[in-house]
């Protein structure tokens, strides 16, 4: 009993320090309270505000004066301006939500929606004024659930959110090493959990209808869209501009950066934008209540300061805010569409029959494409001025930049930069979080990934972690750093080897310039835990799996802007499955087409009419390892379709033909496959998920399993899995499980292993002096 009580108190203490650190990546690992102490202490030291400059440049260290400076700063930001011109901005935004859908949105909210919203919330997030994290409500839902649900439903169904639920803290996190002004801090909004529940329920209902209402030029936050779609289009267009060395029309790309996009949204403009989309009165009132009943207090060294009542702005941290911002951004889309229709602005098409692209949204970033003419640039400035007056948005000139096509004369470039007041992009500058251009010096283009990984690995705090903690850090943080880049670009093999070398050194321990002994091969560490590895990702295979997702999306989303742009340029007369790599293609395209074999290995056709599927060439036999036909078929044209095996009148297989052409076991598989009487189109599905939908995770597992199957030994894999699962399920601290894992992999510094590496002169046991010390048990004793 005493031991259980000590363990309970120890777990409670560790939980407290975990929440104070905080480290979202360390979901499991060793119990390492010293690590969390150091993280929390360092965090407090960094976030502590010793003084601030006021508007006159005078340094103030008195907390009362600092509180006044902070309060005045946020009051100015959250005070509405004299916005105008709503109708001009929103004239092109038409009702995209039908009356029937608006009625569905306005129906009463149910208790099940509240519970679903809670289940979707991350358990340990920073608490708001209520002092609670979602984990409290999840743990004690059987006690507080009824009251919380009643409170949330009352607000949702009445359309009035009480101010007591909508109070919000603003925490200030330094953006620079030595902050002096309030602007040098990043404000983090901390909402009450009950308000987040209300907001999340509202979002879950809204987002089902917004995908059809928001234009395809916006690829963030919406179901069925990925931000990488627009990233691919943008970089393909930039590649076209770079290669455009002649032609009468000079062209350019303008990346717009909006300053404090959420904070400056005018509520009156937002309300008009929502109404133009066709939302019902009840939904409009509820949304406006969510954003207008808020009031802020700023945390100054842990103490709330001020009581700020805003008259404009959205909160980062509110689940509703990203979707409301998308609705506002439709105003800019409307103005640009009108200018394009009137011929004032001309978009960029990367080939003769390709779609013209004039605007792409990336959440709160935008990229405009137009001709490099002073008149068009002046029109863009006029549009932005109108949009700023109505929406409250403001262009950040310092972070806005231009990229010109190669054929644009230098004089024209200089003049346009003067008109717009922004610089042009150089070779390796960042663009949308990635290198603006990927040319011959590819390694230099992606060097920032190596620098970020190195910076994370060199953090002194991570040296406090055991190998169990370092495992989780590698998986959750280090190997996740390049994911955004790897979704669009294939990293060079040399860079991949360098990244893996850095990760290996960190895993085994690295002090200064001397690395510790690597007792197990990297390939072994990358194997799944159930077969004796640690489940680290092989970066090259993971890149292929991520890029394969782009191929899959192009196969299944043929109406998307991304597919239409790439099809027009690279495979106008066929599908991406039959496309050829172009020598003049961008590095983006070469990266994507290089991952096509991953899809070919894992895809299978689901037969509808059979008119799109070739008997000999395609994978269409269910229940087989490779889904391909192996029967020795008689000579036939390679493009003979599966439809020739189907009787269209009966919607059934031609039994005699099938039995005559195929081996008995394949004929049985074909005849046992049902055909739909609705005769749907043939469809490609992914064979490695139950739903038939592609996931990068399943593709990676498929690639790894292919290697394992080709190198598998004669040992019993089931018994191996049982053995290793037993180790990882031991009810002991994670560092002990890792020690057992090292014993089983002969990865401990026994004298035999040290002698094999010429570290000690003799492998003989120092206790008995008779036998080699190769038994881990001897070390334990």
Predicted regions and their residues:
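Short, charged, amphipathic alpha-helical segments
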Residues: 1-3
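A helix-boundary/hinge signal
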Residues: 5-8, 15-27, 31-781
